[in-house]
Every structure is written in C-alpha cells, then in structure tokens.
C-alpha cells in the first residue's frame, strides 16, 4: 500500500492493491498442488530435516566425551532408520503416480541423477517438462542475470530461484 501513496494498511486496501497489480501485470495463473503433490513435498521436507539432524549428530559425535557417544550413536542409528523409511515412502508415492513414475524413469536415465535428485525435481520443480531450458534455469536460479543500466555493464550473476532444487 505504501507504494501507492497510502500510509494506512487494511485488508480492504490490500485487496485493492493486489487487484490493481493483477490488472497491470497479468501474472500467469498456476494450479494449486493436489493432495499427492503436497504429501510428496511434505515428506521430502522431512527428509531434509532428518539429513540435517544426521549431520549435526555426526558433528557432535566427533567432539563428544565417551559417556555421551553411546547416546549419540543410538540417535544416529534411529535417524538412519528413519531416513530409510522416508526414502521408501518417497519411492512409493512416485510409483503410485503414472505421470511421476514416467518422469522419474526419464530423469534417472540421465547419468548422475539418482532417486533423491529425481524426486526433488518432481516435487520442487513441477514446471519441468513444460518450460524450456532457459526458463527452467532462470526459475532454479542458475541463469546469469544482467545488471546493466545506460552505459554501465554489470557483471552477470546468478541469484534467487529455488534453493532446494539447487542444493539437491
């Protein structure tokens, strides 16, 4: 609302600002993810959390005193079993969907693409297959972007995009 010169902020004003934005910019409508896509995204997010916890516990184990090591090892064992179960769930969900199963097979036929990268791309980059490679690169945040103005020619840098896809 401030950009339009209004200092007040209410739901009604916000609705007007959003309507004005939609009129001028005409953003492309996007379909809401279905229940299966939300489930895949949710389980994949949990997988990332478990991997982070495993890394943290492994780091703690290196510095822990002997009495604490046994407990940390037990927790690492539990986290590894949890990770195995999560990976099985992710594979099951992908196999249950004919569209995902087909895309998964195609992605995994590429050298260097394993099950987790493939599932990450399916969950976090649903546009894959409907956009060209330059559009996908920009969406992920790996396409160099110009920073030019007038006679100034800036360095082409990559930024923004979907960090979860880049880190997969």
Functional labels for PLM-detected ranges:
Residues 1-110, 119-120:
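Long, charge-rich intrinsically disordered scaffolds of nucleic-acid metabolism proteins
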Residues 115, 120-168:
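Phosphate-backbone recognition surface of nucleic-acid-processing proteins
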């Amino acid at each position: 609302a401030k950009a339009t010169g209004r200092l007040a902020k209410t739901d009604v004003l916000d609705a007007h600002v959003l309507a004005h934005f939609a009129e001028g910019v005409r953003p492309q409508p996007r379909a809401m993810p279905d229940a299966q896509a939300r489930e895949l995204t949710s389980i994949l997010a949990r997988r990332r959390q478990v991997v982070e916890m495993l890394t943290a516990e492994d780091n703690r184990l290196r510095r822990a005193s002997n009495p604490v090591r046994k407990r940390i090892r037990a927790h690492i064992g539990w986290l590894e079993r949890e990770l195995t179960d999560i990976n099985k769930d992710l594979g099951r969900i992908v196999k249950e969907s004919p569209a995902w199963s087909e895309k998964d097979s195609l992605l995994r036929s590429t050298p260097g693409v394993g099950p987790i990268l493939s599932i990450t791309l399916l969950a976090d980059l649903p546009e894959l297959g409907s956009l060209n490679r330059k559009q996908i690169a920009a969406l992920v945040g790996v396409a160099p972007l110009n920073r030019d103005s007038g006679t100034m020619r800036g360095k082409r840098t990559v930024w923004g995009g979907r960090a979860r896809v880049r880190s997969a």
